[in-house]
């Protein structure tokens, strides 16, 4: 599945991309479609992480924020499994905006506050490495689908 209901949502990517559900059968259930959608979003997050993390200092922590993911333990576990790293759940509202501002200021050299303003974590999800391997194969299939359909 390609989860681009609103196009791709990152700079330089195709804002006109559309969602794709491949391999659906008469026996496919609504919950399987929902699961595929949430997993496909996690694969895209992992691709972004692959691009960003080489530029991040060691010792980073992956933090999930936002109502949709914070209210879904299954999705949080899936995100941890797909990323292959622990995922902390923010105990604060607006942590996405806060984190973005902190990273931007840090990258610009204006503020070196990453260590002084740690996020408050309510819970941490640890990856299941067996599932991480399965999800790695699924990420490859998603990349192949993307390449075939969007170049």
Annotate each PLM feature.
Residues 1-151:
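Glycine/Thr-rich phosphate-binding loops that ligate phosphate moieties of nucleotide
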């Amino acid at each position: 599945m390609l989860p681009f209901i609103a196009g791709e949502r990152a700079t330089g990517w195709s804002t006109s991309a559309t969602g794709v559900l491949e391999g659906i059968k008469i026996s496919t259930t609504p919950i399987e479609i929902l699961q595929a959608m949430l997993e496909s979003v996690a694969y895209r997050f992992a691709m972004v992480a692959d691009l960003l993390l080489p530029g991040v200092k060691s010792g980073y922590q992956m933090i999930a924020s936002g109502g949709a993911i914070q209210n879904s333990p299954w999705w949080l576990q899936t995100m941890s499994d797909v990323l292959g790293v622990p995922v902390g759940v923010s105990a604060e509202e607006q942590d996405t905006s806060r984190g973005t501002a902190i990273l931007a200021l840090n990258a610009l050299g204006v503020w070196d506050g990453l260590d002084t303003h740690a996020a408050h974590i309510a819970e941490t999800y640890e990856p299941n490495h067996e599932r991480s391997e399965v999800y790695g194969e699924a990420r490859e299939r998603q990349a192949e689908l993307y390449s075939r359909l969007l170049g």
